[in-house]
Amino acid sequence: MPPRTALKRQVNRLPPERRISDIMAAAKEVFVEKGYNDALITDIALRAGVVEGSIYRFFANKRELLVKVVEHWFEEMLRDDAEQFAAVRGSWNQIRFIIYTHLTSIHRDPALSRLMFQEIRPAPDYRGSHLFELNRAYTNRLVDVVKAGIASGELRPETSPSLVRDLVFGCIEHRTWAFLRGEGDFDPAEMADAITNLVHHGLAFGGEPASPMESVVARLETATARLEAAAGIAPAKPTSARPR
């Protein structure tokens, strides 16, 4: 085993980018395990393998570190979803994709979702932050889908895209809040189908809820897009689950 001084020299030689990455990874673990209030900078430093002063070299305080962790989470979701979304066609499928991936992110990372809802979003400086802009980009994908659907004649022209966005994400937050409190569970696919059918039925000309088979096809297209993105395969144009 190398002497302790050698390990210390090795840590000191790490480039700043690597140190920041290690600190943020450790901070994410501690925030997820303990929440924001009970997370200590000393715990994060210990887990990252750095001295406490190194954290303050890159981050002003614990709150800034939390914001950076959640920013990174949003950036990852936007990047990953963009690769898969390129393969999705048809307004019903696109709306469902956005709803399903959002529900999946909440189900997969409930602690980060709670931190966003409880610690970051209520802050008075949130609306002027980079994270606010990331969240706007994340939710405005639905606005873009609705606008495109109106332009193509799929969706009613009197539809308010921003109202649809608020209805969908407000509905998701309300329906998943019990889960985030540790009270029960939910199925992202089933909930995505239910919300998508309800919303699209109200927006489309003569729109009707998707049949069970159409829902299955939509899930298969979403799964295929994920696999192709993971394998680096250029997405092929899929068959829409609903005729357009």
Model regions and ranges:
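Conserved hydrophobic residue
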Residues: 37, 155-156, 184
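Helix-turn-helix
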Residues: 22, 30-64, 68
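Amphipathic alpha-helical packing segments from all-alpha helical-bundle domains
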Residues: 126-152, 161-177, 190-193, 197
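Short, basic, alpha-helical segments at the C-terminal edge of helix-turn-helix-like DNA-binding modules
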Residues: 71-78
